[in-house]
Amino acid sequence: MLATLADDPRRSRAIVGGRNIHDGFLFHQPIDLSRYPDLEQYGKTDGFSLNYYSNWSDFDIEFADPATVETLAAHLSTVWLRDADTNLARPFSIPVRSDGARPSGTARHFISVPYEDGHALEDYFVELVDAAQHHIQIVNPYLNLTPKLAQAVDRALARGVRIDIVGRIDLKGDIGGKFLTALNKLFVEKYGDRINIREFKAPDVVLHSKIMMIDERLVAISSVNLNNRSFFHDSENGMMVLDPAFYTRMKPIYDDYVAHSNPVATNVTIPWAYRLLFDEDWVRQAF
């Protein structure tokens, strides 16, 4: 999340989404930083090098209402003013109320510290999936579910909930892209005949948006990947909006992702070395 508080409250803004602080999230090609020798000049390398450059497609939501921005900024400040003994940013989530001029509904902003808050984010997402009655729509490039989340997905499918996912199975260009691609293919292999999985296609662009919509009335816009790393290791944040009117505003955006994607074949090929590697639970939990 990015929050800026201006002297004139009308100019204050908060932006919530999955965008990282990296040139590839803002520019279409590497920026020449040779004039600044202390800055890292990103290259075109692949693998585990941090000196890599990729173009990313992301999605954010901007808030301009002064009261909402101040509430979100105050919640973000708890990360910097977190408890020294437990490392917790309290509380896990807070309500955000509109000013009445906007569509009626309920919104909650959350910040997770999974290694200290008892995996509260994982429990939250499990509850959301368990609450789904007929339809879950997802945009997310990372598909390595935790065991508890996988069980929730299985329960949803068993009770007839339709699940549609726009992802990016081939994550070439991402750091560790070959490993992440293999994990995504394992997800396709397991769920491809039960979940409508599509691959976002855009030349030289890696999908990075994280959107989840449930039953045409709940929308989650966040930094949360559907993988072990987000639920077990990384701090994440996002906004949950329970409002059919907001879903109606988001639906064309989701439809645009669908329009720029293709169905994923279920007969994926996964090298045996990756199968052996990810048979180990502790390895999967690292991703």
Residue positions per predicted region:
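Charged, low-complexity intrinsically disordered terminal segments
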Residues: 1-287
